[in-house]
Regions:
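Alpha-helical hydrophobic helix detector
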Residues: 19-35
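Extracellular/periplasmic head regions of type IV pilus-like filament subunits
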Residues: 57-161, 169-170, 196-199
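Conserved alpha-helical elements of the SDR catalytic core
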Residues: 32, 39, 59
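N-terminal leader/signal peptides at the extreme start of proteins
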Residues: 1-13
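Aliphatic-rich helix starts adjacent to a transmembrane/signal segment
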Residues: 35-52
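Secretory/exported precursors with cleavable N-terminal leaders
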Residues: 12-20
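A short, surface-exposed interaction/processing loop segment used at functional sites
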Residues: 165-195
Length: 199
């Protein structure tokens, strides 16, 4: 049992002390949140570059091994799905996931399979980015003996990323800072004449 005289000397936190603690927490959050958002954007951009690297490597394997088995060494402008021959998901049309050059996460991350897209809208973005065939490389799959081009653009400019990326047969990932307003869909602005992305 607590002695009533002891209770007099017990104290809790004063209102001033609680306000000081709340102010310190507010200051720490004001410092931490922008840094966390920047880290998320940087992470999304790294993942977009890796996705383009994967597409680039898949295109070269498709080209070198004539994986569509048509006798021509050519590229493809299709990510496709299992069961769709001549695509990076199913080059020979075997419907076997083991034959796929890329995994299924690319299927729903493409804005418009086989043709250039003007807006980064897709069913399931890869780390906030949609993918599209580049109009710098042409649109006729049968004439793609000399070039391919893929682009990545953010689904929400300056929220999911600040840069658009592209990859072509020159084996260099290129980028440009988006011109879109914050929150707007990306528009696949990077092209074959952009500078190489160093990070």
């Amino acid at each position: 049992m607590i002695n009533p005289q002891q209770r007099k000397f017990e104290k809790g936190f004063t209102l001033i002390e609680l306000l000081i603690v709340a102010a310190i927490i507010g200051i720490l959050l004001a410092i931490a949140i922008p840094n966390l958002l920047k880290a998320r954007i940087s992470s999304n951009e790294v993942n977009a570059r890796k996705a383009l690297q994967t597409l680039k490597d898949a295109e070269y394997e498709y080209f070198e091994q004539d994986l569509d088995d048509n006798g021509d060494r050519n590229f493809t402008n299709l990510i496709g799905a299992l069961g769709t021959a001549g695509t990076l998901r199913d080059p020979a049309g075997t419907s076997d996931p083991a034959d796929a050059l890329i995994d299924s996460t690319f299927q729903d991350a493409v804005s418009s399979d086989g043709s250039p897209s003007s807006s980064a809208v897709c069913a399931d973005p890869k780390a906030g980015y949609c993918l599209s065939w580049s109009d710098d490389a042409g649109t006729d799959a049968q004439s793609l003996k000399g070039d391919f081009g893929w682009e990545a653009s953010m689904t929400s400019a300056r929220v999911n990323g600040r840069k658009d990326f592209s990859a072509f047969t020159d084996k260099v990932i290129k980028c440009t800072v988006t011109s879109q307003a914050s929150g707007a869909n990306g528009t696949f602005e990077s092209g074959s004449n952009d500078r190489a992305c160093d990070g």
